Amino acid sequence: MIRMKISARNQLRGTVETIVLGVVTAKVSVRVGDNLIESVITRQSVEDLNIKIGSEVTAVIKSTEIMLMVD
């Protein structure tokens, strides 16, 4: 497996708590400690990354967006 390196420094590890699927997008809620972070990503990304409730993900926070990545 290839390990990704990215320039974003704000990365928070968490667990997917809820996924609300729309036609094109999905709202993914990630529990990070006592906090809940929500990210709107494409439905296709949820499927491609195999994100499910209980999945461990990393929230990558940029000034304009929150991306999700999986190992």
Region locations from a protein language model:
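Non-catalytic connector elements of ABC transporters
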Residues: M1-D71
